[in-house]
Amino acid sequence: AININNIDIKKILFSIGSAAILKKKITTKQQLSNLKAHLYKQILFSLRMNPSQQNTRMQIREQFDFATILYQKGLHKQSLTMLVKAKSQALDFDEKTIAYDILELEKIIESQFITRSISGRADQLIEQSEELSLQNLQASKLSNLSLKLYSILLENGYAKDEDEIKKIQNYFEEETKNIDLKRLKFKEKLWFYKANVWLSMLTQNLHSALEFSEKWVELFYEKKDRILSHPVWFIKGNTYLLKILYLKKDSVQFKYWYDKLEAAYTILPQTDNVEAL
């Protein structure tokens, strides 16, 4: 595999054109696309193996992949042990989509191969599966709502009159009427707060925008490990909060939140996405 550390992948992929490659007679024109695809795959593989490029989601997914290999090799108990550990980590970091996939493989193994241990475990797996399914449904609804409102804001700007404001508010209320706010976990809360920020901006409610941008940012300070796993969301939340405080000319609160952000930069991962912000 290609050894890549902190090399800019964009430079590797785009600095050498097809004409230059063909001129050097490295390959034929017919084989060029295959060569590029192979190079691209090797670069991605090397980046994945680089510890500095890994995040929690990738590590959990890797454990899930290993457990799948063990299952396919007939090592069912070993696979279950790894799945339980990966699922626990996924739930700790609110990676519920991966946790649900892990749980589905757990159910397959338990029901097909470990029949003597299924007593009592079946109810536990079913209950956990139903709970995760509900949480994923809520997360999907809230992320869809957030995306839709953000799209409206980018495409149309602020609501032009009272009729538009009422229409947007009615849409928001309809989409959130069945959401149980008390049961929301980190990601669902984040989507809910983001959706409220976009709603507040669309309706030009600066007070509400400040309230929910603060909730957005506070969510990360309550769970500081999420700053490391979701740095872009953390920085964007701070960006909106500071912009709103600037518009409100609240210099005291602006300095308070700015100083907290400065202190948090020491734990932010140094990735291209973070540096681009």
Each model region followed by its residue ranges:
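Intrinsically disordered, low-complexity protein-interaction/activation regions
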Residues: A1-L75, S111
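Tandem amphipathic alpha-helical repeat scaffolds
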Residues: Q63-Q72, E104-F113, N144-D161, L190-N205, ...
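Amphipathic alpha-helical segments of tetratricopeptide repeats
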Residues: V84-D92, I126-L134, Q169-L181, S213-R226, ...
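Short, charge-rich amphipathic alpha-helical segments embedded
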Residues: A86-T115, D225-S229
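Alpha-solenoid helical repeat architecture
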Residues: D94-D101, L137-N144, D180-W191, K223-K236, ...
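Flexible loop and strand-edge segments within Gram-negative outer membrane beta-barrel domains
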Residues: I108-L145
